[in-house]
Amino acid sequence: MKRFSNNIKNMKPRKDSKWHQGYVPNNLCTKLFRSCKDEPIIYRSGLELQFIEFCESNPKVKRWASEPIAIEYYNRLSQTNKNYYPDYVIETTDGNHIIVEIKPYNQTIKPAAQCSEWLKEAWVTNTDKWKAAEEFAHKHNAKFIIVTEKFFE
């Protein structure tokens, strides 16, 4: 898996964001991949924090990492190749690897024709990323999943 090489870790949580954001103290993250221990663990939404807590408390999760890989994808809107950084990668106790993207459920369904251009463009970009992630996962004997609030119900 390609290690990320961008400045995504420099994107600090924003207090003015409509999403609940912050840092998780490293000492509370006992299952982090060893190479990630010195990096700040940022959650960019309440769903991401809930997923971190899930990873830490689930006995089937051996270890996890936050934004550890870059996946190249073709962005149809800009017609260029870009890098996508999935939110998490987990390794299960049975040796499986799962690449995880966290999204609110309403961002995982195709927007209606009357929706804003921003939503339509976000949908195209996200589906480009997810297609590349599925191909990357298949190539690396892993699985790609999108986790929404429905995962925790």
Predicted regions, residues:
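Electrostatic, structured charged patches in enzyme active sites and in nucleic-acid/phosphate-binding
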Residues: 1-153
